[in-house]
Amino acid sequence: MTVQEIKGKKLVKGIAPNVEPEALLNDKRKVFLFGSPSYTNIGDQAIAYAEEKFIKNHFPYYEYIEIMDYATDEGIELVKEIIREDDIVCFTGGGNLGNLYLDIEEDRRKVFSAFKDYKSISLPQSVYFEDTEEGQKEKKKTQDAYHQNTNLTIAARETQTLDVVKETFNSNVIFTPDMVLSLDIVPRELERDGVLFILRADKEKVTDEDFISQMKQWAEKTTYTERTDTVLDTVDTIDYADREKHFMEMLDRIGSSKLVITDRLHAMIFSIITKTPCLVFGNSYGKAKHSYRDWLESLNFIEYTDKNDVEELERMIDRLLQAEPNDVDLSKDFQPLIDFFAS
């Protein structure tokens, strides 16, 4: 089999955008990452960015090959032709294992059942199946697909998900933080001004708009405010080549703010990277809350709250703004993932 034959038959756009085609056929042990996002959620783009850095930093002797989400079917067919016994199949991490984002879940089922004879991992995820007839029906489909693969490991990124995975699946399970927390990025020194509200506009949103208006009015007494989201509406897609640019732009936007108020897990994590004081509210099933409680509670410039009394929140924000930002070292918490890839 030659690269030309692969290209001629099945090397479509979205398969291996991060390497030269020849890399598909070299003698290195390969790590195939499926589900690499092309949609405009910068949190998920940052996860994919961090996954690549993690594998390349810890295992430079592996060939890391991404398959974009829009090329899943073609990617499965091509990888079947070139995969070897000791290669590893991954599906990208995030907060989409469950029935809320079925297109992604259906791809994950396909991948894990297609490669049931190979070492496989769902990278750090939050898991949520709604307690509805539809949610439970989809959970059964996911169980049926995953249980075909006795070589599957599921990485849970909070204790809430760890419990769900243990109850729901027969798979091996490991516990690590979100992949973006593995990044070692020195933030740019930027002039800071204003309060940046980074808020959901999707099916996970639970923060009340009247409450948001109250918070904005409070902030506007002393500074200007801006509202945005970590899902970009200025572009339709983000391919591999543009991922880093959009991620760094989001970090700069957060790093030039005096304060971030958010209900987004990754806006909180981006605030940690840029040392930006951040007040965090919840989503519909506790992703940010449980990640904060499990890994980040020792940080003095980040605070999670369920409160909605503006006066009380003012005092909380004052504390955050006065803090000299500290650090948290989570490197040891990624050891289970290093051990997985090392074996």
Curated annotation (Swiss-Prot):
- Write down what this protein is called: General stress protein 30
Q: What induces it?
A: By heat shock, salt stress, oxidative stress, glucose limitation and oxygen limitation.
Superkingdom of source: Bacteria
- What EC number is given for this enzyme? 2.-.-.-
Catalytic class of the enzyme:
transferase
Q: Does the keyword Transferase apply?
A: yes
**Which organism does this sequence originate in?**
Bacillus subtilis (strain 168)
Q: What are the entry keywords?
A: Stress response, Transferase
Q: Into which family does the record put it? A: Belongs to the polysaccharide pyruvyl transferase family.
- Entries under Pfam families matching the protein: PS_pyruv_trans
GO MF annotations, alphabetized: transferase activity
